């Protein structure tokens, strides 16, 4: 059915379209942390996230990464291919920061010799726990071949993103990706890529991402606007 709300999340709402294989994603003016324990309405955030993610996904598509992204249709809306989301958050870390630093008792800002890929089980009731390959297979989420693909594709995406952000004076510290199965059963990149789900530091070490909200460092939208303008100029 056309224009029916089929999913509501912390940052986005998903609607059906006339095409059963296409969805309309609406980005919200909402910032959350601690799995939604803290919520705040921030005017203009949805449009910034949508525009940033659209630019990144367009570049990924052109670079040969298969994604769910079709097109941006308004400041806060885009069309995407419908996928069955894999209940995993795939995190890649280039530099120590955030929960990684807390978990292992290391200072933030240490460059990792080899980027680290981590998986988290998408389950709000369980607070998205860390999960390894054996757990994923036990739960029937993905098999060995699919795990290898997720790791390899995430590392490939990282190399592209690191280069693009370096060109605009930003250091890609870490990020979270989500993938899904398309109508043909192929794993493709889904969700979004914005400062909501990555860490970006400028040359002076200033946070250019959602940590501005998490740590009360200033105006989130001002920072996101700077990131958007840099990406447009890329």
From Swiss-Prot:
Its EC number is 6.3.2.6. It is an enzyme of class 6 (ligase). It holds the Pfam family SAICAR_synt. Keywords: ATP-binding, Ligase, Nucleotide-binding, Purine biosynthesis. Belongs to the SAICAR synthetase family. HAMAP family: SAICAR_synth. This is Phosphoribosylaminoimidazole-succinocarboxamide synthase. The lineage of its organism: Bacteria, Bacillati, Bacillota, Bacilli, Lactobacillales. The gene is purC.
């Amino acid at each position: 059915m056309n224009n029916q709300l089929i999913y509501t999340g912390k940052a986005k709402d998903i609607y059906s379209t006339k095409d059963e294989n296409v969805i309309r994603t609406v980005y919200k003016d909402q910032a959350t942390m601690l799995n939604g324990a803290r919520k705040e309405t921030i005017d203009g955030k949805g449009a910034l996230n949508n525009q940033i993610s659209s630019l990144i996904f367009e570049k990924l598509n052109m670079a040969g990464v298969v994604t769910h992204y079709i097109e941006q249709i308004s400041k806060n809306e885009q069309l995407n291919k419908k996928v069955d989301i894999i209940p995993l958050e795939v995190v890649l870390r280039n530099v120590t920061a955030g929960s990684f630093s807390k978990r292992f008792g290391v200072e933030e800002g240490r460059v990792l010799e080899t980027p680290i890929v981590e998986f988290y089980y998408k389950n709000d009731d369980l607070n998205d726990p860390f999960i390894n390959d054996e757990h994923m297979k036990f739960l029937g989420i993905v098999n060995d071949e699919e795990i290898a693909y997720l790791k390899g594709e995430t590392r490939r995406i990282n190399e592209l993103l690191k280069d693009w952000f370096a060109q605009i004076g930003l250091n890609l510290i870490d990020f979270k990706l989500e993938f899904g199965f398309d109508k043909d059963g192929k794993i493709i990149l889904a969700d979004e890529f914005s400062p909501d789900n990555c860490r970006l530091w400028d040359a002076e070490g200033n946070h250019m991402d959602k940590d501005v909200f998490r740590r009360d460092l200033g105006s989130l939208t001002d920072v996101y606007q700077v990131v958007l303008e840099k990406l447009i100029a890329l």
